[in-house]
């Protein structure tokens, strides 16, 4: 929609960016208040409120947010109605951001260790003392030409935040490792192979009439759930007279499976084989694009799919042959159709193959390309910075563990951490056993995490509501989107920006380090990227001079270019003639169940989210369980093992065990047990400590053969009764009367 003269005059009268044009925006009245608070006094009007735009950092999606501020205090977070990714919607994690800002257990000031590593015993110091200590150690290493003994571990980064860390590490000769959840690594590797792009593709569900999902819990936590939930709503109800069909393939009954028209409970690790069998039906019933057939088979043609006839693979995948044919025919005849894949489908030793085979179905039905439901995203004119995260593989983490343990090929004399908790996230590698051998550990933390408990120096880091930042949205909604994060409020504690501290260290050390990092602070680095957007003369915000443009992108919460598009259709990937078979750790006779770890909607995979009580209390949609870890089994498995809800069992794998209560999920198939990720922390404040167990600690370190990502669903387990029971905290069902000590139980009923 264009900007009318009346709209433009309103903007000029009410906005600090009077010479800005917002292209392609309807500009709701409410949004006239969304302006940068950088130069606005903290209390503009006592009792009045204002809304400021920024970027959510509670997951990697990068949704746009607006924050309600009254008298200098953030009161509420909502979705930015103008941001193209989420268009005003926000998930529970995004809403809980204010709890992170005002958390009572935040690291309030710099801390220096006084006790043994791991005991979390510290004393408070000033920033001057803390930075003197860190600067001196860094200067000594540079002076000894030992900068390559520095290791930096962060969470996933993009844009100028990633560029600052990359240049800092490059100038020192240090290693920079990004720690992400395993599924992010394998999805990126598979899409790079399937679509030839470093950016994740945009699955426009709202344009499809049929969606076939392989393990991707896109209505739960997969990749960009708010974007996909909006698309799903339009897919179901957004087109008069048209209601799309959803089929979900998953060994666990997830929220996406619960919403599907049909759920195929396949055997774990067989998703790629099922995709090839569907392809066989498409090819042999003339429902597939001939050119795509030739490309996918490297010229071998339709005969290459003959080994995957439904009758030949039915037992291996656990789906009857006729059901495979019915799904394939519906997928081929109900155009446009889209196949998406991720989550547990990629969590095996053949994970990349499973995902690529599923993505290949889109080529067979002509769904890839401009104007179709599977679209590539154009590169934004934002400079030579990392546009996508670069998560480290399991082998890289194993190499770091070995280096810490042996000191070869060189010791780790300085370990710097930000937004990463390897003690918790790499428990399957026993990372905490070797962490103590690092020379000096510095952790930039918002909440004291399990790794920070081992640190020699803990520096309080800003939350995303107190800091500057940028976000190269990935996946974007078919066109490039850059989100701009700005400080919404003044720092609540004595915290600082991790990136600003790196820049100040570079100035203090001097030499090549200072030359590589010319910016005085993160804000100026981001402004450099914004200048390139301004010079392009494209996109949603346009202005005569840069300062007006800068105010405009802050006011809108970002920049996007709806006219940018990738017109070329990528070359389909060549599929293997002999698909790899999923391998599992543990003998099936001794460990009869396949363990399926999954990411709950609230606390996700852990980290600071586990410390937020709102998210601990978010019910898992299918089970309604909260506040603890559980083992989810089906009724057949429960009957065979004599288990009932609330029985405490030991979940034992070949490498470890955890104890959790049982929940009997009527939708769970036999042969699998599902356990949520995200709990079992020893730190993270009062709301996370001692709640549940960390399922990562019992996983075997098997990896996907292609991407090197952790095959987190490749571990077999057994359930052993402990003879104890525990109350399962949930929202569903009746609550029987129970008594308290020294009190008489009273049952309240409706008379």
Question: Could you describe each region identified by the protein language model?
Answer:
Residues 1-285, 299, 311, 320-326, ...:
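N-terminal export/assembly segments and adjacent metallocofactor-ligating motifs
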Residues 175-186, 243-246, 367-381, 438-451:
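A generic structural motif
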